[in-house]
A protein has these predicted regions:
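C-terminal structured domain segments
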Residues: 374-447
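Helix-turn-helix repeat elements of alpha-solenoid scaffolds
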Residues: 92-103, 127-140, 165-179, 209-238, ...
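Alpha-helical scaffold segments of alpha-solenoid architecture
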Residues: 253-384, 394
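"A position-specific structural signal for the A-helix of alpha-solenoid helical repeats
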Residues: 85, 89, 118-126, 153-162, ...
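Mid-protein regulatory/catalytic core that forms ligand/cofactor-binding pockets
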Residues: 112-246, 250, 262, 266, ...
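Solenoid-like repeat scaffolds
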Residues: 31, 43-44, 74-79, 95, ...
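Flexible inter-repeat linkers and adjacent short helices
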Residues: 1-174, 410, 416, 422-423, ...
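Alpha-helical linker/edge segments of TPR/alpha-solenoid repeat scaffolds
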Residues: 163-174, 204-211, 240-262, 301-319, ...
Length: 452
């Protein structure tokens, strides 16, 4: 007995068991009587649509998705060439029902014929905003069956999957970045800029300074090229090409510079860092009709002030600390990254920052780090991943422990710091545990001296 007969016979048997005639069932289900007759009684049954099957299921009191497995086999296994007009509504309906198992079966059968890859890709693009998890399943099949290794749909599929994998675990993000990175330069320009920024954030959170610099350079070069093309088009009185960027172009341009500044700060190459501070300090020349262009120009000017003060503290100029604290009072969103820099400078030069640590204890020890960072990530000015904040907290607790150790303080504060450091690393970045060996050695020396 074929699968088609099984689907027809299952429907026919259930209709008869519930006492319906064709006329009464047509009235109850809303399916045309002629369609029912052609489907159930004809020697060459007429294929039904997924919408008609849903109506029959509802009339029979069956759960949503009843007989879908048999419908799939009829639709895809028995027809010589599947009809996309039947298959597309079927996939959409399976998405609505969250039936990834059925979608998996549909795609397996459908993509034996590679001519359907483009239809599957376009459907995934339509679904990505509302049903990301199931759209990703479609992209995975595009990747599996696409034969052209340089096709745009293949590269975009890799990018969509990469974006979906980025989360709060730094090690998981690294795996996603390593898989996607080879495709980044094949993306359309708008996606390429966003992809480069995401990759840069991942590498920065991993403290992979060389790769962060590479991504920052690519962001700067590409955003500069786009800007030049826009200006040339304006000069030639041509229509400026529209780019559907996630953020204004100045964000990418400025972030390419800011990332290099931040890396050189970390590598203690302070003269180089200052060069890039000067470059993003004044971007008033950057023309863009985007409504938020001026807002971000002002943000980069503000960041130049912050990083200038960072460099002063990191080069031993303690007199700038009071002004820094005044600015933090007005801009509490900068407390986390700034406190980390101030702690590093304090540990390097012996500054006393007890007042700062006491003032911002609620930010240093939030009830839930992730909730605090996610809330901050929704701010208008924020374009960094949450993982950068997580890594800052790990570094913050590490520097805090050193700060208290250097002052021979072993009390409940240090216990709290060590516990929070350990739990944060365990949850978000277990690879950092080796970095703490020096700290633990220092703690053993401290506790040993106190016991004596």
């Amino acid at each position: 007995m074929t699968e088609l007969k099984t689907l027809r016979h299952e429907l026919e048997r259930e209709i008869l068991q519930q006492g319906y005639s064709l006329s009464s069932f047509s009235h109850t289900s809303g399916v045309n009587r002629g369609v029912l007759s052609a489907t159930l009684n004809s020697s060459t049954p007429r294929p039904i649509s997924i919408n008609q099957l849903d109506r029959m299921n509802m009339a029979l009191g069956k759960p949503e998705g009843w007989l879908y497995e048999l419908f799939i086999e009829e639709c895809l296994s028995l027809e010589q060439k599947p009809n996309w007009r039947r298959v597309r509504p079927l996939i959409v309906r399976c998405v609505e029902l969250q039936r990834s198992d059925l979608i998996d079966r549909i795609l397996y059968l459908l993509l034996e014929d590679p001519s359907y890859i483009d239809e599957v890709f376009c459907l995934a693009e339509n679904l990505i905003q509302k049903e990301e998890k199931l759209a990703i399943l479609l992209y995975r099949y595009v990747i599996e069956y696409e034969r052209n290794s340089h096709s745009e749909r293949l590269v975009v599929s890799h990018y969509r999957i990469f974006k979906s994998l980025i989360g709060n675990n730094i090690e998981t993000n690294l795996k996603a970045a390593l898989t996607f990175a080879p495709y980044r330069n094949l993306l359309p320009i708008p996606m390429q800029l966003d992809a480069l920024l995401k990759l840069a954030n991942i590498y920065y959170s991993l403290q992979d300074w060389a790769q962060t610099i590479n991504m920052a350079d690519e962001i700067y070069i590409l955003s500069s090229k786009v800007y030049q093309l826009r200006m040339q088009a304006r000069q030639d009185q041509r229509v400026i090409p529209f780019l559907d960027l996630e953020r204004p172009l100045v964000v990418y341009y400025g972030q390419g510079l800011l990332l290099k500044c931040a890396v050189y700060e970390q590598e203690e190459m302070y003269d180089k860092a200052q060069v890039y501070v000067d470059l993003f300090a004044d971007l008033q020349w950057f023309e863009d009709e985007h409504v938020d262009n001026q807002y971000y120009i002002d943000r980069f000017q503000f960041y130049s002030i912050i990083h200038t003060m960072n460099l002063e503290l990191l080069t031993g100029k303690e007199q700038g600390l009071d002004r820094y604290l005044q600015i933090l009072e007005q801009h509490p969103q900068e407390v986390l990254p700034s406190t980390l820099i101030i702690l590093e400078a304090a540990n390097k030069y012996g500054y006393n920052i007890d007042q700062l640590l006491s003032r911002y204890e609620d930010i240093i020890y939030p009830a839930d780090i992730l909730d605090y960072l996610i809330a901050g990530s929704k701010a208008r000015y924020n374009y960094q991943d949450v993982t950068i904040g997580i890594n800052r907290y790990i570094n913050l607790y590490y520097q805090l422990a050193i700060y208290h150790c250097d002052r021979n303080i072993y009390d409940e504060r240090l216990e709290k710091i060590l516990y929070t450091l350990e739990s944060t690393i365990e949850r978000y970045n277990r690879g950092r545990i080796m970095d703490c060996l020096h700290l633990f050695k220092k703690l053993r020396q401290l506790t040993g001296s106190l016991e004596k």
